[in-house]
Regions:
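Amphipathic hydrophobic-ligand
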Residues: 9, 103-108
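A generic structural signal for beta-strand entry/edge sites
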Residues: 10, 86-88, 117-121
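A conserved amphipathic terminal alpha-helix motif
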Residues: 127-163
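Hydrophobic pocket/interface hotspot
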Residues: 26-30, 66, 80, 91, ...
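Hydrophobic ligand-binding cavity/cleft-lining segments
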Residues: 1-58
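Glycine-rich portal/gate segments that line the openings of hydrophobic small-molecule binding cavities
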Residues: 37-38, 48-102, 152-163
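Short, solvent-exposed aromatic-acidic interface loops
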Residues: 93-98, 125-132
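Hydrophobic/aromatic beta-strand elements that line small-molecule binding cavities or substrate pockets
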Residues: 15-17, 76-82, 106-115
Length: 163
């Protein structure tokens, strides 16, 4: 399922996929996964993650931060804002550099894990905050691009979780 909603200052996009594993296994398999393993391919102009820096311990405590480095340059600071095992976790992306910085000032992200039949529906949601009024008309195009990126990423996550 794909949803796109435009708010005055932001665009909400989400993508979902049902995976044949339990909610607990989906959550515990997703949270600690190295980002450069999950997000390892280009999708149009959206680059793969090259590396994660400055993370201490496992990613499970609200307030933790890390720096995400992108292929081809660019980076962003990620802060864990919610952690409700095994149902959801949320984060913000800020201090965005590289090509996305011209369009987006920040992102609120959320991963949701819900029972679905004998598996788990995993939903990945981004709220994109525009850089300026001038870039606002470009957000829907980026949102459509992001949903393709998210769909492919969730497909890859499914493959990794099912093994």
């Amino acid at each position: 399922m794909v949803t796109i909603a435009i708010m005055a200052q932001a665009l909400v996009v989400e993508q979902s996929r049902t995976v044949p594993v339990t909610v607990a296994d989906a959550f515990s398999g997703t949270v600690p996964m190295p980002l450069n393993e999950l997000f390892c391919r280009w999708y149009g102009p959206i680059p793969p993650i090259k590396a994660v820096r400055d993370q201490t311990g496992i990613w499970d405590a609200v307030g933790q931060t890390r720096t995400i480095l992108l292929q081809g340059g660019g980076s962003m600071a990620e802060t864990l804002t919610s952690f409700n095992e095994p149902h959801s976790f949320g984060y913000t992306l800020s201090d965005i550099t590289g090509p996305m910085a011209a369009l987006i000032s920040g992102v609120n992200g959320e991963w949701l894990f819900q029972p679905a039949g004998t598996g788990t529906k995993i939903t990945w949601r981004w709220t994109l905050h525009r850089r300026s009024a001038a870039t606002a008309p470009l957000l829907p195009a980026f949102g459509r691009l992001w949903k393709g990126y998210a769909g492919r990423s969730l497909e890859h996550l499914s493959d990794l979780l099912v093994g």
